[in-house]
Amino acid sequence: MSNVPADLKYTDEHEWIRTEADGTLTVGITDHAQSTLGDIVFLELPEVGKSVNAGDAVGVVESVKAASDIYSPVSGEVVAVNEAATDAPEEVNGDAYGVWLFKIKLAAGASTDKLIDADAYSKLID
């Protein structure tokens, strides 16, 4: 069974989201996603400064088995990307919740209401 930390929010597309003290959202892929994909060999992340809408494909994660889009969980502006993750994408396999992919600042009027909690995500992947 996959690890699903209770302090994070999730999407149906297997991204995790952590709200930081300054209100930005840190985004990564879940343990379930990395486990399903297998050995991750490449990450393509969005550009800093890019405006995105909730549900937009903003990046790609490639493994030896498959490639999958990474989606923005909310509407906003990408304010940081984890260059270390692109340099060593295999680290996501070892620590899916420790290796973040990008950070986003919510757009005015945007919300996190569509994100699901750990219980709902656990049911989704069971």
UniProtKB/Swiss-Prot annotation:
Keywords: Lipoyl
Superkingdom of this protein's organism: Bacteria
Cellular-component GO terms for this entry: cytosol; glycine cleavage complex
Xref: CDD domains: GCS_H
Homology family: Belongs to the GcvH family.
NCBIfam families: gcvH, PRK01202.1
Complexes and interactors: The glycine cleavage system is composed of four proteins: P, T, L and H.
Protein name per the record: Glycine cleavage system H protein
Species of provenance: Burkholderia cenocepacia (strain HI2424)
